[in-house]
Amino acid sequence: MAVAVCGAVVPVVARLEGREFEYLMKKRSVTIGRNSSQGCVDVSMGHSSFISRRHLEIFIGGSGDGDDADVGDFYLRCLGKNGVFVDGVFQRRGAPPLQLPRVCTFRFPSTNIKITFTALAIDKKQKLEAPESPVKPVQPQISPLTIHIPDNIAHLISPLPSPTGTISAANSCPSSPRGAGSSGFKFGRVIPPDLIAEAAQSENDKDASGGDSPKDDSKPPYSYAQLIVQAITMAPDKQLTLNGIYTHITKNYPYYRTADKGWQNSIRHNLSLNRYFIKVPRSQEEPGKGSFWRIDPASESKLVEQAFRKRRPRGVPCFRTPLGPLSSRSAPASPNHSGVFSAHSSGVQTPESLSREGSPIPLEPDASVIHPKLAVIQEARFAQSAPGSPLSSQPVLITVQRQLPQTIKPVTYTVAAPVTTATSQQAVMQTVHVVHQIPAVSVTNVTGLTPINTYTVGGQTMVAQAAVMAQPKLEHQENGDHKEVKVKVEAIPAIGHPALTTASRIIQTSSSAPLQTVTIVQTPLGQHQLPIKAVTQNGTHVVPITTAIQGQVTTANSSYSLIESPWQWRGNGTRAASPLHMLATHASASASLPTKRQNGDQSEQPDIKRGKTDEREVLAMTGLDAQSEMAMAASNEQENQK
């Protein structure tokens, strides 16, 4: 490539391209820096304090004199005190000249200022083999040899205050110039097709070599704890000082060489607060100062395994969505779900996005009709966000269980399970409709059996499970009215002898009249009544069912009625009761004796309501009454003997 200047053809050997400028190199040596009172440079990079007055020098190595001499390789010599990054590799001041590749990128430390270098000259042998490219002359008045960056765009290339904004220069390729109409020092150029192919090939080679190598100046994808583990595990004796950890990190990750020193504070905080790092004091024999840091031996294997595990970049969700055909990298959404995901969807759905977007067209019947407690909110198909992952369609059904309203109360309870018998009758579930709260009672049907201790209701032989009968909870009625509890008895299954093993008592009655409803009358307790009542018939005391049910019932062909509060059996048969119960019954039936105040005060206090007295108190009172009666009887006998 050549440029005609004042009728003379000047070869262009290389191109330097920045954000807002482009410079064509037509001589063997070019200096890059910033202009000052001491002198000017060929390429001025503005007034940034991070750039020295003479920062870089690019020259051509080869034999011959003059501009038309044979062109060899390009070399870079660093003259600035801050150094320079060449494709992510830091080049220090005073280092030997670095041979430049055909395409590379320079970046000044602590800034985002970059220069892309492209070598346009080829060897003499290649010139003979390759066809000459056409030359297009440009206007002679726009071919300066020295360029300057205007001050009005200096803010675009000023250094950033935070190291987090540093952009990596690795894997960068020649970018197209921005602002084609705004740059006043832009030159016309013609690039041969073979050079374009070489530039593309070099870019592909760099991509294949791996852009996130340790020499990359971008921020490494590791946490500070991982960097500490890497440094300590790579030490010969598995321990390092704080300064040694700093040195290891800056040596392997160039990003931290020029970044803000705040990362060192983070390293110190991790060492102090992380329980996996142990501080080991330095022995007196060891020279130097500062303690060593080691890894907890109990957790060393686990930490070493995770030391080089890369973190997810910020902004990426920490969970993987289920696999599906929809994502930003996959095929377009199906028409049925066009309302759920837009074309710019990223494949990650949030509750807010689901509520804003429309519902998909259902492909199946409404699930709320099949199951009223489930309401289908959304059905969506997701895709794995990782590139190159296999796609699969798995529907995700989001459901919400509806709770029954508080006003709806169940009114039917099942108290008996269907019993399988040897008869031909079909088992029927017995259902008891509860009008008021009553004790649990289970009634079963007995067919084909007429033994003793069975009773007939409505033409059916019935057996009552006494083991299920429980004493009901007593409720006081202030007005003294009786409270009725009705139980509706419906059809019940038939059972045989094996099913009777669970029934503890079988009672026979001679009643054969049809009966549809069993009415249980609850007798309220008075103010001074005890929960135990004495019921006598034919001079025989009767005890409550809670006591009588423990004994064996032997009387047959006798009529009984069921009374609540307390539950008692009444009849003309004989009952076996303990003396304690006889005394308790007698004491409850006897009248209480009046008492007088010791101070002789005639005024009497009103009676205070007494609570329920348990059986122990009744027995104690009964014992006192019996002892007093026995003492009075003994005194009377002594007086009679005298």
From Swiss-Prot:
PANTHER family: CHECKPOINT SUPPRESSOR 1-LIKE, ISOFORM A-RELATED, FORKHEAD BOX PROTEIN K2
Region Disordered, residue ranges: 201-221, 323-359, 589-615
Function: Transcriptional regulator involved in different processes such as glucose metabolism, aerobic glycolysis and autophagy. Recognizes and binds the forkhead DNA sequence motif (5'-GTAAACA-3') and can both act as a transcription activator or repressor, depending on the context. Acts as a key regulator of metabolic reprogramming towards aerobic glycolysis, a process in which glucose is converted to lactate in the presence of oxygen.
Lineage of producing organism: Eukaryota, Metazoa, Chordata, Craniata, Vertebrata
DNA-binding region(s) in UniProt: 219-314
Primary residence: nucleus
Gene Ontology CC: cytoplasm; nucleus
Designated name of the protein: Forkhead box protein K2
